[in-house]
């Protein structure tokens, strides 16, 4: 496309999108993932729940009573050498005692075992009452009551993220209705945003960066709708982009191995680049059809797997042809993803944003990218 940059208000978004196009949103919901404990010594320890370990299914874990284990980041770790953290609280008008025991270390995170003494209270109840919403650290402030509303998208449904898919924060019911009136089809999928999203690329070469893995789920209906739209879509947010592009590569795996297990469908970091030659001739519709066939064979309503895809310059986009995204910080994998999409144009776009006082990051302004 042309190198044009235009500044407009977000409410006029529908006027830039063609009737009959398909727009896809990530319906994940941010969980109140930060738990605070005070030791007898007075030290404050923060336990930040990143992903469920036991059980490792999000829904089942939230439904757990009396016991649940998570992979957690621990704040003030040096003060928690050993022993069990304890906190007493009232949940649903019942007094309970929650304990946390630290398990093995995984990189910068630890397994943490939570136990509580009331079989009627679920882990979801505990996070709801006792957890704090993890707003971005650079805001340099405590979480406020208003964040519970402003840091969730209006269409958030499926609990599991530790950060909001922030491109979606701009969408109000009014904008969503205007999109429908314009004849834009709206669909959803789920990617639970992990803390790894914020991990800066520290290596000079991208080969040195290990991408984080995130859980994804896409319903049969969304895949059928993608096929109906010729395998092309407008993605809202980098998380939707990564999920949609991962779908293509999952389809390619299934074309080669129709009996692949859920584990084998996981998209590895460099997989798209290693298979670039063979994928040159595989259309997105063909790849998506392979997923649909897989769901039909197994009588499944949705695809559940995980992705570690890293989208960087040199990546060949297969499904996403337009994206809505905020402005990202330097040294982020998000900026790599954008620059792979608009090719060398990202500098012009970011210069324009800086010169026109656009705001960056989570609570910042938005961009509609049409390469």
Question: Can you say where each PLM-predicted feature lies in the sequence?
Answer:
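Surface-exposed, charge/polar-rich loops and edge strands
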Residues: 2-3, 7-371
């Amino acid at each position: 496309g042309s190198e044009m940059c235009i500044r407009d208000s977000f409410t006029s978004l529908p006027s830039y999108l063609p009737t009959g196009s398909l727009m896809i949103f990530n319906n994940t919901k941010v969980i109140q993932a930060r738990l605070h404990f005070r030791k007898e010594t007075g030290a404050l320890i923060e336990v930040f729940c990143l992903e469920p370990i036991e059980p490792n299914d999000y829904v089942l874990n939230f439904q757990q009573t009396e016991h649940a284990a998570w992979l957690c980041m621990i704040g003030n770790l040096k003060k928690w050498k050993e022993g069990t953290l304890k906190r007493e609280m009232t949940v649903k008008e019942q007094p309970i005692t929650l304990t946390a025991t630290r398990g093995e270390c995984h990189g910068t995170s630890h397994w943490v075992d939570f136990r509580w003494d009331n079989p009627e209270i679920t882990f979801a109840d505990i996070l709801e009452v006792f957890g704090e919403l993890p707003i971005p650290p650079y805001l340099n402030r405590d979480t406020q009551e208003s964040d519970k509303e402003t840091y969730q998208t209006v269409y958030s449904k499926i609990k599991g993220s530790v950060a909001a898919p922030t491109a979606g924060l701009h969408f109000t019911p009014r904008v969503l209705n205007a999109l429908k009136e314009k004849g834009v089809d709206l669909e959803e999928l789920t990617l639970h945003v992990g803390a790894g999203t914020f991990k800066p690329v520290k290596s000079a070469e991208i080969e040195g960066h290990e991408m984080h893995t995130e859980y994804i789920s896409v319903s049969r209906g969304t895949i059928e709708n993608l096929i109906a739209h010729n395998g092309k879509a407008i993605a809202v947010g980098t998380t939707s982009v990564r999920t949609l592009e991962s779908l293509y590569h999952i389809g390619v795996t299934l074309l080669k191995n129709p009996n692949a297990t859920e584990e084998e469908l996981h998209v590895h970091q460099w997989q798209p680049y290693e298979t670039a030659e063979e994928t040159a001739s595989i259309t997105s519709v063909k790849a998506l059809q392979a997923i649909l066939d897989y769901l039909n064979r197994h009588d499944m309503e949705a695809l559940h797997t995980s992705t570690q895809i890293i989208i960087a310059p040199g990546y060949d986009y297969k499904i996403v042809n337009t994206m809505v995204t905020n402005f990202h910080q330097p040294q982020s994998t998000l900026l790599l993803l954008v620059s792979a999409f608009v090719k060398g144009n990202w500098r012009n776009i970011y210069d324009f944003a800086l010169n026109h006082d656009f705001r960056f990051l989570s609570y910042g302004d938005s961009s509609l990218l049409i390469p």
